[in-house]
A protein has these predicted regions:
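Signature of the N-terminal lobe/flap region of pepsin-like aspartyl proteases
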Residues: 20, 28-147
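Aspartyl protease catalytic domain
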Residues: 1-29, 133-204
Length: 204
């Protein structure tokens, strides 16, 4: 009787889930919710610009506040703009990696309608591509290059947001895979699925 030996073969394990801790602060457009830290413009040096942002399950892009006349430095802090190079900026400061794409309409949340509008200017933003990292800037932060970042100047988008929608987005003829697609393609996560809890201040 032939004896079959078990073939020794090691199958690669899928990547473990990547866990992003909340910022430890509560911010929001319509209340106080858990925010999460992201960094923009880093090149594995720990010198990126940090932002506290809300999570958007319907948005495909990263949206962050830009400097505007109606929001001073104290206001910018409440919009999630963190201290950068020892100073409080009023919005995103374009990094050496920033590439301008143009001014286009911002993606609106699935629940949005005109009755929510508080700013009568149009909802366009300055689109560009830059490096986007998870968590506060550090040499351990996972960073993806060539990600769409939208700079918003309108009060309707008071806080920035980190989009988790899968697929591609961008101006006509300039679509790029979204962050979660690129994160999956770089073998840093096992699938394009995610779990998320929006902690509220009153439930502390």
């Amino acid at each position: 009787m032939m004896k079959l030996n078990r073939r020794e073969e090691t199958l690669p394990l899928p990547p473990t889930p990547y866990v992003v801790s909340d910022s430890g602060q509560f911010d929001g457009n319509d209340g106080k919710w858990s925010t999460f830290s992201i960094n923009i413009g880093d090149v594995d040096s720990g010198q990126g610009q940090n932002f506290r942002v809300l999570i958007s399950t319907s948005s495909p892009v990263t949206i962050v506040p830009g400097a505007t006349e109606w929001c001073d430095s104290d206001c910018a802090r409440t919009r999630g703009v963190e201290i950068y190079n020892g100073q409080q900026p009023r919005g995103i400061e374009q990094s050496a990696q920033w590439k301008l794409a143009g001014i286009y309409k911002m993606p609106e949340p699935h629940w949005w309608n005109e009755s929510y509008r508080i700013d009568q200017s149009n909802t366009t933003g300055v689109w560009g591509v830059d490096n986007v990292g998870l968590g506060t800037t550090s040499i351990q932060s996972p960073i993806l290059g060539e990600q769409y970042v939208v700079e918003t100047l309108v009060e309707d988008y008071f806080m920035g947001s980190f989009g988790l929608a899968a697929g591609e987005t961008g101006p006509s003829g300039g679509s790029k895979p979204n962050f979660i697609d690129n994160f999956y393609a770089s073998h840093q996560i096992a699938s394009k699925s995610y779990g998320y809890t929006a902690g509220a201040h009153y439930r502390k």
